[in-house]
Amino acid sequence: MIQSTEFFWWKFELVFPPDVEESFLWFLNMAGIKSYAIERSPDNLQDQTLMVWLPSHEWLKKDREEFENSLLALNKAFREDVLNTKWEKIIDEDWSSSWKKFWKADPVGSKILILPSWLELPDIYSNRIVIKLDPGSAFGTGSHPTTRLCLEDLERNPPLGKKVVDIGCGSGVLGIAAIKLGAKEVRAIDIDSLAVRATSENIVLNNLSQKQLSVSLGSIENLANQLNPLSADLLICNTLSPVIKELAPYFFKLTHSYSRLCLSGLLVAQVEDITNFLSILGWELIDSYSSDNWALIRLCRNHP
């Protein structure tokens, strides 16, 4: 019997809420999958669509079922929603351009533009500060509400001439933005080697030097020992509330009397609790901002 040698792609679609985006992107990168895109509708901020293109000869039925079940299980760890999924057979589509066409130039605030690395700068955004990112590297392109809150805060409070520390750097977008908004230097750190690799790649994409933005693999304790006695003027940490609580005892060691904290990854409902927790450690709330049930808080040391 002659077996078919037809080559095609499986296109997988999954509608999901924004708060699990970074977990999904982490999973895709761990699986070595780079041909994916996320489609967002301005009319529905609560749902977005993940699209993944998989070569048929590498992804048999059992592999596709395992792939889908893994994503659904990952979502269930965060919330109970049943996600809508779809598989489609794509024969004539050029996947190398198909997944890329869904990524667009993404304006943030009034000054910043997130630009996928393969796109030309649109004339309409020629006056913006451009941050080039590779969506296929890891951790997305700064589209999560908490990342946008941090970018907007950096724009409101540009770190001119300041030393910045980015704890849990992900793609490196916040450190890159800090440099492009005038920071003297940024030290970024993450416990995930994928994040360190992604940040390193994005540093190169943006023509920055290691002297301007350096990234290392390790814990906040490692960084505190490396930086001492060099203190940061601004400490950025975009992660979950329980993680912030674990890291908070090190914030004093990384900063000085007039430093500022920029903390996000928090739900609006968690702001009061985390603010009270940090107050006990000597930090005072300056401002808070919110978007789509997510929040950012800015703090300074509580001087008697």
From Swiss-Prot:
GO biological process assignments: methylation
Q: In UniProt terms, what function does this protein have?
A: Methylates ribosomal protein L11.
Which protein, by its recorded name, is this?
Ribosomal protein L11 methyltransferase
* CDD domains xref list: AdoMet_MTases
Give the reactions, separated by semicolons, that this protein catalyses: L-lysyl-[protein] + 3 S-adenosyl-L-methionine = N(6),N(6),N(6)-trimethyl-L-lysyl-[protein] + 3 S-adenosyl-L-homocysteine + 3 H(+)
Q: Which SUPFAM superfamilies does the UniProt record give? A: S-adenosyl-L-methionine-dependent methyltransferases
Provide a Gene Ontology MF annotation, just one.
protein-lysine N-methyltransferase activity
